[in-house]
Amino acid sequence: MDYEALKDQWSDVEDRDGIRLSWNTFPSSRMEASRLVVPIGAVYTPLKDKPDSPLLQYEPVTCKAPCRAVLNPYANVDVRARIWICPFCLMRNPLPPHYKDITESTIPPELHPLSTTIEYQLARPAPTPPIFVYVVDTCQEEDSLKALKDTLVMSLSLLPANALVGLITYGTMAQVHELGYTECAKSYVFRGSKEYAAKQVQEMLGLLSAGVRPNMPQQPARPPLGPAARFLLPVQQAEFQITNVLEQLQRDPWPVANDKRPLRCTGVALSVAVGLLETSFQNAGGRIMVFTSGPATEGPGHVVGPELKEPMRSHHDIDRDNIKYYKKAVKFYDAMAKRAANNGHIVDVFAGCLDQVGLLEMKNLVNYTGGHMLLTDSFTSSQFKQSFVRIFDKDANDNLLMGFNASLEVLTTKELKVTGLIGHAVSLNKKSSSVGETECGIGNTCAWKMCGIDPSSSYGVYFEIANQGGPAAVQPGPQRGMMQFLTYYQHSSGHYHLRVTTVARNLSGPAGDPTLAQSFDQEAAAVLMARIAVFKAEVDDGPDVLRWVDRMLIRLCSRFADYRKDDPTSFRLEKNFTLYPQFMFHLRRSQFLQFFNNSPDETAFYRHVLNHEDVGDSLVMIQPTLDSYSLEHEGSQPVLLDSASIQPSHILLLDTFFHILIFHGETIAEWRKAGYQDQEGYENLKALLEQPKEDARELISDRFPLPRFIVCDAGGSQARFLLSKLNPSTTHTTGGYGGGVTSQTIFTDDVSLQTFMDHLMKLAVSGTS
């Protein structure tokens, strides 16, 4: 099968199962696997939209303990004997009584050959409706606070009618608003400079007095019993009160001198929010949504002092270990993140500030709990408002697309073992026969807790080939390795759902089987390797990570390219490997591994988004797309991400996922400034100027977070966003000045892709890594 047909096949599998594998044939021995260089891995999107598949309204049929695999199309079913054989542990299981009518021709949906992904609505209802706690920073300008209040009031109409809502505001003090008290505005105040233990928070809020009575049945529309009901009210009952409280919010009254930052106790507000939820709502779906407009400057978790002359930490400070508050703040927020994750609660952080707010220190609050991280200049910006609204997107039945309190378990057949996961989750420390000996990412477990999950949440799951002792019993036909992904989550309709994806791939033949190389998916592999590189970058030095990326690339090319030893001119890669070196070239230069021009908060944000998206979107972040528009061609033409693509009479549209940029070449910019497009007879120029805007609108329409939109001209200051992403094939060191070169000269010492490839070929053919 040729490469294009294979790509279509992998794309169909991704649409059906939400999964892309780095290798679509598994090596049959551990020795063979070690020579692959790129690990066997899957980028899995559990809640990928599947409009055509039915929701099964019954419990899944599972294998006996300890296996617990779910019945799937790969199971052998004996309809006469009413038994099925589990493909994971080969145990025989009786079919339940309600399967008595099945025959070879009438089978239940989960056994249909195309039902490799299926979703069940479980009988177990969620213990409470979804909970939303807004944690609002009041140390901000009037216009910004007003815009934020308007957005929050509007968001109440997007929540499910039975959702519980709470409000905490903070500045110099943290205040928990008692929404259930209607006589007047009433709140509990916590001092911003003091650290409160979980028990203290619960005592001060009176949460320990009655407690939720165990084993009490819950009605879905009623708030749970217990003292927390004073602070968390159902939207449908209390929309008026909540709106009133939000509209009456004032700026923090504490005076701020000109040479000082406002006193902001983000850490105290967060610990109060986590304490409020963990007392009464353990293992219930809830979101703590933090809106901050500046760094924490007092109390636990503060990231900078109140003096303005003391700057926020930079990457340079972190490298030199010149960080006064960093380690203590990280320790505080990480402990908070673990508490929230253990209880199934999500933490989102929305920053509306030109300066850093301490996302670097707080990142694990979001990363451990599957929350959203959003970095904007102000809460007045459309980027914040539109991104925030997208979080509350709904399905055809008017249910929120977000899932709560989610967990993922991976089962494998004896040939495979799971080595870890890289994504927004924490380990559930579950051991099984599927757990491998080595560790990649969050390892030593076969189950993870994600808390928050949405249709684009994607996870990198890594595998190894098990040690097979002695010759395996030869089975007729090709042997298969299998994996099953079980995703449990609380649906916003009030029920628990289970989504099951079962994947089977052939094992390779004897050593040197060509099907192994042909099964390499370079796009999925690049994304899986990028996740490992970013995971390493969190703990290792930057140069060490770059060396690791280079070493792995050289080893892969040495293993799979065709060449004569020590002859770089003979170097050839098969079609399904040719793009991989260029993905690695752009990954090395990307904002995920290079800190130049990025603050630590921005780096934390970019890495967070990379670890959330699927293969297609992640590739756009690693290697942005570039389209060219000109009067000679109709519509857009994809062009190389190269400085040679900049032409005076062309318009370029760059999509980096985080930015969408329209760049007018020199001549086009002059024509536009002269107003030719408004004159009669120049309709084609007007259409040319409009076309990239239309395409940009389409790109923005379904993206989260909303990208920053930039329109610039050749020579303008904003053009730097484009120039920094291009391969510098035309620099001040190539080509003579005054020559007839029409492309842009880039002043940089970075090597070009051509130089990078020359070095790669030289090293690969010499057999040194």
From Swiss-Prot:
Keyword list, A-Z: Cytoplasm, Cytoplasmic vesicle, Endoplasmic reticulum, ER-Golgi transport, Golgi apparatus, Membrane, Metal-binding, Protein transport, Transport, Zinc
Pfam family for this entry, one: Sec23_trunk
Its membrane topology: Peripheral membrane protein
Swiss-Prot/TrEMBL GO biological process terms: COPII-coated vesicle cargo loading; intracellular protein transport
Localization (cell): Cytoplasm; Cytoplasmic vesicle, COPII-coated vesicle membrane; Endoplasmic reticulum membrane; Golgi apparatus membrane
GO molecular function: GTPase activator activity; zinc ion binding
Residues where Zn(2+) binds: 63, 67, 86, 89
Entry GO CC: COPII vesicle coat; endoplasmic reticulum exit site; endoplasmic reticulum membrane; Golgi membrane
Family of this protein: Belongs to the SEC23/SEC24 family. SEC23 subfamily.
Subunit structure: The COPII coat is composed of at least 5 proteins: the sec23/24 complex, the sec13/31 complex, and the protein sar1.
Role: Component of the coat protein complex II (COPII) which promotes the formation of transport vesicles from the endoplasmic reticulum (ER). The coat has two main functions, the physical deformation of the endoplasmic reticulum membrane into vesicles and the selection of cargo molecules.
Name of the molecule in the record: Protein transport protein sec23
Organism of provenance: Aspergillus oryzae (strain ATCC 42149 / RIB 40) (Yellow koji mold)
